[in-house]
Amino acid sequence: MAQEPPRKQKVVIVGAGPVGSLAALYAAARGDDVEVYELRGDLRDPTTIPLNFTKSINLALSERGISSLKGSNRDGMIEKILNDAIPMHGRMIHGRDDGKLWEAAQAYDVHGQAINSVDRSTLNNALLDELERTPNVKLFFNHKLTGADFQSNRAWFERRAPGDTPLPGSSNRVPEIEVSFDYMIGADGAHSASRYHMMKYSRVDYQQEYIDTLWCEFRIPPSDTGDFRISPNHLHIWPGKEFMFIALPSPDKSFTCTLFAPAAHYAQLESSPQKLFLSFDANFPGVSPDLITPEDLQEQFKENPHLPLISIKAKPHHYGSNIVIVGDAAHAILPFYGQGLNAGLEDIRVLFDFLDKHDAFDLNASLTARRESRRAAFQAYTDQRTADAHAINDLSKQNYLEMRWGVKTPLYKIRKSIEEALDLYVPSLGWKTQYARVSFSTQRYSDVVKVVHRQGRILGYGFASAVISSITIAGILAWKIPGRLSPLPALQSTVQLLGHVWTKISPKNT
């Protein structure tokens, strides 16, 4: 049997958002012919941005995302993205006591590391510009994936460009094209068409959950002098037990803000403008009228959509050697850890690390050999990445409670202070906060969960030992000085405190 002549592989990428665009850069750098198909119009066109971006929450770019971008070896692109980013060194918690407004800063990291607030369009435009300069990449906008055959590796797209006329005699059908490929990467978001078609071939365990929280975007404008109205180097949080309001800085000196609240609360706010203003005054002191006028508050609440939050888990993330899904298509997560973008970009780095490890781009190998290498790489990717995707999904849900309420509690501050002190003064222990491990390292998410649980157990046992020692000393003193010292009140309060602290710092609550 004659050996197949070597040739380039062709990869079809569905979705031209940040994750799909980075996947295209990685594949192109390895010699593949790349075609990127995007349902929407060219995202760089300012006239199409309002139509395309149903989600304009500023993105938080941290170490995982940055290191994955660097893996593309496009230094100029990365420099542009980071130059336009605004570093946030911590949270700024806002509140009011006895009628007086207060704010309290909480640093993210004892070593001064920061996460970066980036504009969604700035990031996407930089990636698309880089793709357009890459000779073995073709971009196709206004193309909707309508079908896929992962046995013959063919896909069908409807071309939906403005001005296209329906086919004669059809019921508003538009022209459809057929595309062949060696493999497909699905990066088309939470409501992924590529995942939908993959599930016809692969037995996918799929879980979708909408939490009882809606979100609506607001904007704090620049001051009259054209400056930021509040500190630009913090993520600002107005926490509440059932809801919260956050603000992230933007390059134009404004803040992109988001109200997260249950659907029932939104229904109350929609009933009258007065209820909206009173709710903000009671729960988010200092926002209106100080930062947003009541008129703007009402207009933005009325005009901007009230959108749900979706959480998705799926396994496996691939089918054979034919398709792999990444980003929100594989694991849509809640935005409360700022890891949605970072996890998606990290998917690409991890995926191509496995493809490289299995020699899937060896031009000297036959197509059959490369197909088997790709199959093994996709399987290894699924085996590792599903565990990590599920871990950050769960961590993001847990962090919602912390942001709404935990950041104000003394016990949260105590544990954070202890862990940061150990990190700073005894670095040989390798002790770090959960937030630092998630945001300022590339440690696997699933490993972060294991290590943080172990740290929680150690802290709990250490605290218990300290309390038991105190009780023992109190008992000895009471025995030595009878009649002068009754240990009972101290014992009762200590036991109560121990039980309360243990429930907060034990592993199931970390």
From Swiss-Prot:
Keyword ATP-binding on entry: no
Domain of life: Eukaryota
Purpose of the protein: Catalyzes the hydroxylation of L-kynurenine (L-Kyn) to form 3-hydroxy-L-kynurenine (L-3OHKyn). Required for synthesis of quinolinic acid.
Cofactor(s), names only, from the UniProt record: FAD
Protein family membership: Belongs to the aromatic-ring hydroxylase family. KMO subfamily.
Annotated InterPro entries: FAD-bd, FAD/NAD-bd_sf, Kynurenine_monooxygenase
Entry keyword set: FAD, Flavoprotein, Membrane, Mitochondrion, Mitochondrion outer membrane, Monooxygenase, NADP, Oxidoreductase, Pyridine nucleotide biosynthesis
GO MF annotation list: FAD binding; kynurenine 3-monooxygenase activity
EC number(s) stated in the UniProt entry for this protein: 1.14.13.9
Protein name: Kynurenine 3-monooxygenase
Any GO CC annotation of this UniProt entry: mitochondrial outer membrane
GO process annotations (BP): 'de novo' NAD biosynthetic process from L-tryptophan; anthranilate metabolic process; kynurenine metabolic process; L-tryptophan catabolic process; quinolinate biosynthetic process
Functional pathway: Cofactor biosynthesis; NAD(+) biosynthesis; quinolinate from L-kynurenine: step 1/3
Pfam families: FAD_binding_3 (PF01494)
Organism the protein comes from: Aspergillus oryzae (strain ATCC 42149 / RIB 40)
Enzyme class: oxidoreductase
Keyword DNA repair found: no
Location(s) in or outside the cell: Mitochondrion outer membrane
